[in-house]
């Protein structure tokens, strides 16, 4: 520790940090401490705090244990900063704030307020957090939320002020003075601008655009970046903390509340989003803000972080202007109006701009780009179909006592055959208290404990009853007819499962037997990979809901029902996004809703070459999603599209499937289902492929074809027969009726134009056999 008034050198300036995780489940090893580990990485990152982790500990949600650790780290270890994670909510055992209040000597309410304000900009549930920040001696204590995402965001909210706060506590006079001098040199914020004279909305927007450009030039000259009003945008403060590296804050679209931006379109230009809410240049970090500590001298970078939070003149930009000024995805605004130009129909593509991708490459790409989801702790009864994220160990022996394998008599093997007195009985669920002596036996039932003195069991079939009680209710004497050997028909302790044995390995896909095994070993809570949530929508102006009466030019939507049922058949939770018209604004709004609520979004229609097929443009222009492929060399399903979008470090998966009913179902089985299986942690998510014989001749197509078929087994034949479902036109949903397989037919060549009845082919299983 530095003495009072001591001038710290660069070496002395190293910040010593402790990370304290408060969690019952982590303490009992039922969950991994993701937030604590992540905070350690953030603290040590040289482009962030650049601190040293001097202490790390996990404690249960107990006030005394929390207090004891905090006091020890403050008074004995003399840490500069303590970050706690967990226990700040409303649950009965969330007591971290109470423990902190009993330890600190002075409060730091500004830091708690900064975290609350930042959290409320992210989610209204931020109001349920109860952080306490304060000082004990020369140690700063900060309460952070228990989730990895929440703790990282709150750490980022207070990060710009942390180095200066610690310098103040350590009396680092020179560094404190440098910061204060830098702040004194800052110009005062200008007064609020007068509202423009009342004109037409279009004129008002144009005036504001000019005004923004002038203000931007002034800011460039002064080197001071503006900050946006916290109530005007949902862009988190994490995006404003320009020195957070992309490796920690994943690039992605920031979600705006849909009422945040007012959008208008001028007659003279295409319908592009024009944001009229007050959006400042803080949305787009300037080079001044992006500067990292190792690229500047002294404390300039730290002062720059403080400058970015001072009030400045707000500016107004259209969404397209904001996006053009921002190169990173953190600052893309997802508004409710699309920037896709729908007016120039004559200039649309006549040939697809997307290259043809082979089926193998497309499938590999999907699996490579699809992440495995995080974990959660569930009750074992809810484990059907889930994948274990941790090994499961037995905490007891099974059986926990020597148990009888059969109904019969517990005997002493050394006594041999002969007549024996019966001293009682041992039943399952009871522990016998008597000891079998020479010349005695005890009647036992299957699964019952073996009494002391006995070392074998003779089944009832190998005995004769010699004597019974007068009323016939008791056996008094029995004759043993065989020679028993020691251990005969006895399951010793731990015979089935030994204490500490791994009974289920990480990655196990749980079924009924695994659920029963968990019950057997008494493990009622297990850590599993999360199920992906899947949102499904159909696109097309021609579509009606199934319950609607047909109208001229309309058809009923079958894709959504079929896709939802397919996903639900595999056990995944779904969200029905309904029917979306062929309009970029509607598509964008529906995609935004799906992105905010689900892990995977499935659309059908709007991906081919029609003049109303806008989906790929919305993904590219509005969402800035990465489209990995837009056409696949296969039949059916040529225009199948796969895209990903990273938001706040979370990857969203988007499958834009063809609109033809059969194409949608086939591509869902080929691409979507394996991706979902990978997301839930299944080690081999590939579909099941078997061999089958063709029941009829099949003509080949120039493209690899997935031909719908019904698999049946004939008596005493090892391979099933694959019967075609008939006409394979992609619009004919009847071809999917009763189909439980897809014939994987090769493309046509000069030598092979068809396959003949009886030939063996590969078949992908898509239904119950």
Curated annotation (Swiss-Prot):
The keyword ATP-binding applies. Pfam families: MoCF_biosynth, MoeA_C, MoeA_N. Residues 327-769 are annotated as: MPT adenylyltransferase. Its cofactor is Mg(2+). GO terms for molecular function: ATP binding; cytoskeletal protein binding; identical protein binding; metal ion binding; molybdopterin adenylyltransferase activity; molybdopterin molybdotransferase activity. Palmitoylated. Palmitoylation is stimulated by GABA type A receptors activity. Palmitoylation by ZDHHC12 regulates clustering at synapses. One of its GO terms (biological process) is establishment of synaptic specificity at neuromuscular junction. Residues 261-286 have a biased composition (Polar residues). A lipid is attached at residues 212, 284 (S-palmitoyl cysteine). The modification Phosphoserine is found at residues 188, 194, 200, 262, 268, 270, 338. It is a lipid-anchor. It is an enzyme of class 2 (transferase). SMART domains: MoCF_biosynth (SM00852). Keywords: ATP-binding, Cell membrane, Cell projection, Cytoplasm, Cytoskeleton, Lipoprotein, Magnesium, Membrane, Metal-binding, Molybdenum, Molybdenum cofactor biosynthesis, Multifunctional enzyme, Nucleotide-binding, Palmitate, Phosphoprotein, Postsynaptic cell membrane, Synapse, Transferase. Residues 187-199 have a biased composition (Pro residues). InterPro entries: MoaB/Mog-like_dom_sf, MoaB/Mog_dom, MoCF_biosynth_CS, MoeA-like, MoeA_C_domain_IV, MoeA_C_domain_IV_sf, MoeA_linker/N, MoeA_linker/N_sf. It is found in: Postsynaptic cell membrane; Cell membrane; Cytoplasm, Cytosol; Cytoplasm, Cytoskeleton. GO terms for cellular component: cytoskeleton; cytosol; dendrite; extrinsic component of plasma membrane; GABA-ergic synapse; inhibitory synapse; neuronal cell body; postsynapse. It catalyses: molybdopterin + ATP + H(+) = adenylyl-molybdopterin + diphosphate; adenylyl-molybdopterin + molybdate = Mo-molybdopterin + AMP + H(+). Pathway: Cofactor biosynthesis; molybdopterin biosynthesis. Microtubule-associated protein involved in membrane protein-cytoskeleton interactions. It is thought to anchor the inhibitory glycine receptor (GLYR) to subsynaptic microtubules. Acts as a major instructive molecule at inhibitory synapses, where it also clusters GABA type A receptors. In the N-terminal section; belongs to the MoaB/Mog family. In the C-terminal section; belongs to the MoeA family. Homotrimer, homodimer and homooligomer. Interacts with SRGAP2 (via SH3 domain). Interacts with GLRB. Interacts with GABARAP. Interacts with GABRA3. GABRA3 and GLRB occupy overlapping binding sites. Interacts with ARHGAP32; IQSEC3, INSYN1 and INSYN2A. This is Gephyrin. It comes from Mus musculus (Mouse).
């Amino acid at each position: 520790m530095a003495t009072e008034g001591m001038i710290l050198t660069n070496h002395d300036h190293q910040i010593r940090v402790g990370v304290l995780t408060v969690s019952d489940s982590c303490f009992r090893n039922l969950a991994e401490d993701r937030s604590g580990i992540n905070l350690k990485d953030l603290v040590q990152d040289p482009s962030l705090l650049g601190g040293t982790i001097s202490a790390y500990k996990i404690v249960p949600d107990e006030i005394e244990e929390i207090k004891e650790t905090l006091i020890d780290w403050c008074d004995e270890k003399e840490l500069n900063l303590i970050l706690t994670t967990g226990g700040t909510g409303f649950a009965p055992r969330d007591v971290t704030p109470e423990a902190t209040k009993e330890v600190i000597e002075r409060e730091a309410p500004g830091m708690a307020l900064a975290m609350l304000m930042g959290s409320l900009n992210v989610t209204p549930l931020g109001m349920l957090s109860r952080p306490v920040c304060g000082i004990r001696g020369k140690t700063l204590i900060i309460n952070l939320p228990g989730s990895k995402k929440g703790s990282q965001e709150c750490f980022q909210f207070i990060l710009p002020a942390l180095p200066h706060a610690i310098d103040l506590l350590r009396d680092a006079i020179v560094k404190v003075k440098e910061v204060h001098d830098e702040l004194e040199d800052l110009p005062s914020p200008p007064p609020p601008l007068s509202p423009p004279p009342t004109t037409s909305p279009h004129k008002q927007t144009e005036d504001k655009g000019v005004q923004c450009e002038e203000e931007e030039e002034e800011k460039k000259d002064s080197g001071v970046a503006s900050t946006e009003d916290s109530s005007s945008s949902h862009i988190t403060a994490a995006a404003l903390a320009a020195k957070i590296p992309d490796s920690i804050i994943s690039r992605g679209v920031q979600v705006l509340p849909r009422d945040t931006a007012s959008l208008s379109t001028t007659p003279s230009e295409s319908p592009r989003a024009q944001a009229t809410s007050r959006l400042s240049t803080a949305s787009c970090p300037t080079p001044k803000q992006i500067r990292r500590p190792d690229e500047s001298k002294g404390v300039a970078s730290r002062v720059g972080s403080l400058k970015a939070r001072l009030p400045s003149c707000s500016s107004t930009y259209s969404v397209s202007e904001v996006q053009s000024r921002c190169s990173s995805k953190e600052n893309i605004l997802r508004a409710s109006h699309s920037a896709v130009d729908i007016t120039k129909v004559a200039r649309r593509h006549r040939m697809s701009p997307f290259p043809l991708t082979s089926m193998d490459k497309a499938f590999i790409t999907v699996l490579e780009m699809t992440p495995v989801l995080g974990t959660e702790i569930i009750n074992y009864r809810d484990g059907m179909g889930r994948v274990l994220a941790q090994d499961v160990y037995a905490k007891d022996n099974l059986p926990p006592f020597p148990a009888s394998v059969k109904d019969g008599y517990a005997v002493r093997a050394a006594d041999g055959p002969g007549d024996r007195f019966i001293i009682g009985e041992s039943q399952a669920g009871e522990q016998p208290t008597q000891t079998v002596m020479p010349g005695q036996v005890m009647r036992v039932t299957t699964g019952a404990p073996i009494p002391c003195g006995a070392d074998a069991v003779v089944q009832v079939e190998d005995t004769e009853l010699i004597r019974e009680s007068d009323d016939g209710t008791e056996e008094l004497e029995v004759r043993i007819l065989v020679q028993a050997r020691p251990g005969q028909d006895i399951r010793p302790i731990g015979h089935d499962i030994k204490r500490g044995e791994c009974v289920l390995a990480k990655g196990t896909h749980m079924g009924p037997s695994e659920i029963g095994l968990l019950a057997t070993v008494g493990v009622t809570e297990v850590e599993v990979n999360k199920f992906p949530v899947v949102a499904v929508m159909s696109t097309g102006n021609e579509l009606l809901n199934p319950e609607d009466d047909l109208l001229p030019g309309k058809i009923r939507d079958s894709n959504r029902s079929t896709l939802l049922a397919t996903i639900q058949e595999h056990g995944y939770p779904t969200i029905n996004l309904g029917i979306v018209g062929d309009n970029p604004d509607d598509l964008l709004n529906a995609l935004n809703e799906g992105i905010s609520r689900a892990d995977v979004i499935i659309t059908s229609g709007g991906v081919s070459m029609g003049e109303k097929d806008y989906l790929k443009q919305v993904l590219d222009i509005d969402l800035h999603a990465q489209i990995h492929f837009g056409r696949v060399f296969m039949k059916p399903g040529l225009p199948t599209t796969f895209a990903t979008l990273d938001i706040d470090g979370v990857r969203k998966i988007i499958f834009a499937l063809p609109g033809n009913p059969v194409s949608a179902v086939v591509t869902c089985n080929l691409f979507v289902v394996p991706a979902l299986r990978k997301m839930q942690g299944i080690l081999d998510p590939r579909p099941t492929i078997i061999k089958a014989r063709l029941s009829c001749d099949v003509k080949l197509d120039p493209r690899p074809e997935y031909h719908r078929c019904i698999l049946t087994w004939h008596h005493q034949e090892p391979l099933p027969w694959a019967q075609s479902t008939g006409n394979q036109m992609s619009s004919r949903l009847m071809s999917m009726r009763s189909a439980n397989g897809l014939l994987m037919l090769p493309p046509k060549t000069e030598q092979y134009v068809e396959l003949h009845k009886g030939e063996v082919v590969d078949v992908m299983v898509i239904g119950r056999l």
